[in-house]
Amino acid sequence: LLHNPDGRGVANALRTGIRHAAGEYVLIFAVDDTGPVLAIDEMLRLMESGCDLVSCTRYARGGRRLGGSRIGGLLSRIANAMFRRATGMKLTDATTGIKMVRRSALESLRLEATTGGWAVAFELAIKAQLAGWRMGEVPIISIDRLFGGASTFALGPWGKEYLRWFLWGVAQSRRIPRLPSAVMTRQPATSDKS
């Protein structure tokens, strides 16, 4: 258990965790998330096959989003599709907070997001692609707040931070020649009891 001296929020918690990470890979994951734990083995396989970043996806074949706000889900799906079209983003779900990153690669990036909930994960995906990292995706069924209290998502302040990184990513993708990056996808393993 770590003490976070940087203050509240996902970005500060993430920075503290990265500073104290000792392993080769860093798993970024919300402690109150359910379901995607099953994807960790597939994420590890992709990392071991050479990926620098593996992101879970709700929007590729085999992925789904259950629960949560319909408006939030629709905004997320539309924003990801628009961002992919505008920038050539290889990930189908750049905004998800469930990522595994090679620590040595992560240390080469400066994460700047300060507020905005999981916008730091979006920033990470953008900067990883611009740097030409090898990326992978694992489809998940994300179960969002079906129980356990209300989400802390606030469209106003969080939306501004996501918009900031959306616009920054579009501008950078037009300014900086894109380094080749490809996405490898693995379907999560299923239990076969036949």
Please annotate each region the language model reported.
Residues E42, A86-G88, E112-S194:
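Hydrophobic helical membrane-anchoring modules
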Residues V31:
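Walker B catalytic motif
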Residues N4-H20, Y25, V37-W118, I143-L163:
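Acceptor/aglycone-binding surface of glycosyltransferases and processive sugar-polymer synthases
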